[in-house]
């Protein structure tokens, strides 16, 4: 149950969203995907779900009862799909944290459902090479910053500290340049404009 906000006077405590971990990570082959990994992982070779779709709906409903939003960690496209399904069923909005690989249909669903995409551009630098190996068949659907903006999604840039450094200017640079070193831009068609990146960093 969320703290009551009905009592008068200043409050020194605020409640953030309910965080739900739906899958793992790409590098450990535990991000829950629609398609299998090259070497397989999990019962069907496509990663692992940390919570069932039914339990996810229950958790989001519990957040709704407590007047909380839900922030769901979803890196794989199957995980993101199940989170969007759960938001649709429960009728509340929240955010998907990471959203590293998405189907075309689900890119459009973010805006339709009012779901925020909370992404970390520096993960692109960390995962670029591994993505080309593990997700070579879907690399063009990874870190789809520009597609999400074009679809009307509320995009928020963050750091995911301490996994990546708290460096908003570095995140903005990667979001715009799609590289963190001297190599060419990685899928430059997904680059944000500087204005878009700054706006997303202020959310």
Regions found by a protein language model. Give the residues of each.
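Metal-coordinating catalytic core of metallo-dependent amide/deamination hydrolases
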Residues: 1-77, 109-116, 121-122, 172
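His/Asp/Glu-enriched, well-ordered alpha-helical/loop segment
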Residues: 60-71, 75-94, 98-99, 104-108, ...
